[in-house]
Amino acid sequence: MRVVLLILSSLLLITAGYGQSTNWTYPGNSYSDGSGTGGLDSWEGDYTYLTEGGSVYECFDYSNGSAGTWYTPILKTYSYGFSLPTGAEITGIECQIKKTGFGAATWYDYEVKLYVGGVQVGDNKAITSTPYSGEVTDTYGGPSDLWGLTPTKTQIEASNFGVGIKCKAVAVEYDYNVVIDFIRLKIYYSVPSGSSPFFGVPF
């Protein structure tokens, strides 16, 4: 019986390190990065607005724009405050963004990219061909998607790690706006197994 229990304990230690993830996590800071076009000068709001069910971030033009294709600045979010176990190896990054387009324009994603070390890098996960039809929540990345990167635990935990979105408006006249209700991230990771307490060898 004792041997069986030791073997079971070893198996639990082996499997415990796989398929783990953080909870959905909201940013601790944000700002409007760069400049937009067509009167879409900046994002208005605060990072505290980017939690589910709260206020919304907004980028708008009510008088200065015109018919054409225009772009918002990047809404950059960071300071997610992740804390991963010692030895964690990142296996995937998932992002969800809830957004709505309004007014005399059809709205699309233009760019959804990560910030690592404060620099925008990796794959562009924007869903560029599908317009925002009412209020939508889109998912980018996933449990085995690293966005073309090899991020480390240290990079994920850094305050300058985050994600940004840039939107595109195909406008027929002035008076159009887009709002972001929330942006959140989830990190998937594994922890390499240590030594077996029963066999005394690495596994």
Name these PLM-found stretches.
Residues K98, K113-G117, Y188-S190:
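Predominantly extracellular/luminal cell-surface or secreted proteins
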Residues R2-G34, G38-G39, D181-F203:
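Enriched but not universal
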Residues A67-T86:
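Short beta-strands within extracellular/lumenal beta-sheet-rich domains
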Residues D61, Y78-S79, I93-C95, N124-Y176:
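Cysteine-clustered segments with highest specificity for TGF-beta superfamily mature ligands
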Residues T86-A104, F161:
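A short beta-strand element within beta-rich, extracytoplasmic domains
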Residues A105-V119:
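Short, surface-exposed beta-strand/strand-loop-strand elements in extracellular ectodomains
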Residues Q20-G68:
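Activation corresponds to long, low-complexity, non-globular regions
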Residues T100-G103, V119, C167-V170, V191-P192:
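Acidic glycine-/aspartate-rich tracts in secreted/extracellular proteins
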